[in-house]
Amino acid sequence: MNIDPVFLNVKKLGSLIRGKELSPTELTRTFLERLQNIGPSYNSTVTVTYDLAIKQASKAEQEIIQGKYRGPLHGIPYGIKDLFATGVDAPTTWGANPFRNRTFDHNATVVMNLKNSGAILAAKLAMIEMAGGMGYNQPNASLTGPCRNPWNKNRWAGGSSSGSGSAVGSGIVPFAIGTETWGSILSPASYCGVAGLRPTFGRVSRYGAMTLSWSLDKVGPIALTADDCGTILETISVPDNKDSTVSFKRHSLKKYGPQDKVKLAVIKDSCIHADKATKNNFFNALSILKTIADIEEISLPDYPYEAIIRTILLSESASALEDFTDNGTASGLTAQ
């Protein structure tokens, strides 16, 4: 392979694959090697689905050779947070030692949507155990240990989608899928210097994913660019009768330009507590967005937002995880 695919974004990889300049099999082998050799040093990988990935890559390659191109993710490997059911192809641990060897008899809807798009499942990625439901403040509360930041291994990768952020940031997968209840996509994306998209509630099916909070859980992508995240979201946001909260309208990626007159609200003093570098990045991003949007600074009503969300989260997570606390499974967790 004459092209080094590491740190090429999804859009570029897809273009090379479609043009038959890049082999899905060779691409997948490259990332499988990185997952096996580099992933452990970041504690970001729980299971490398080697045989499955090679099988899916070979199928994708043959389809593309035959002119059966499925779309922009066809032939591209990815990793997924280890709370999505992946059938018997790989254990689904929820990041917790008591479930180290557990498999399910079904696949999560997002896994099936990506399979149907021709994307290649290469790894199950690390996470805070039980998605943080048993102790978000302990980075070591993860099956693989504290997930390390690709920019500085002495720092944490964020959570609870720790492995998803770290794996994309360290170039061991081109993109990943995470979940967010209260910051679990945006936090690791921010910590690891990559793009994360936390969709509107109900945009992506949660069927086959661990439940932490029925009212707050969301599924979304982590990738190298915002454009990539939009492409991935378009693929995974499909109506699903297995999740009654999912929108019946499929998401369609729209490219905005100055002619669209988009309005963008920015919350006043929203980054007042951020450090200088973060503030600079924030305002630089706003200056770019000003080329396609009218930006208006707004103030939100003075409500106790944190207390409201915490009340919902604590009550729903206590209910969702009740069986595991009652039967003693929780005693096997790292966070206490």
Language-model segment annotations:
Residues 1-55, 291:
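An N-terminal boundary/leader segment
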Residues 43, 247-250, 261-263, 267-268, ...:
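Flexible, acidic loop-helix segments that line cofactor/substrate-binding pockets
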Residues 73-94, 258-267, 311-336:
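Short helix-loop capping/hinge segments that flank enzyme active sites or metal/cofactor-binding pockets
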Residues 21-29, 58, 276-299, 321-334:
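Acyltransferase
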Residues 13-19, 79, 98-103, 217-224:
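Short, well-ordered beta-strand elements within core beta-sheets of diverse protein domains
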Residues 53, 63-140:
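Acidic/His- and Gly-rich active-site-bordering loop/insert found
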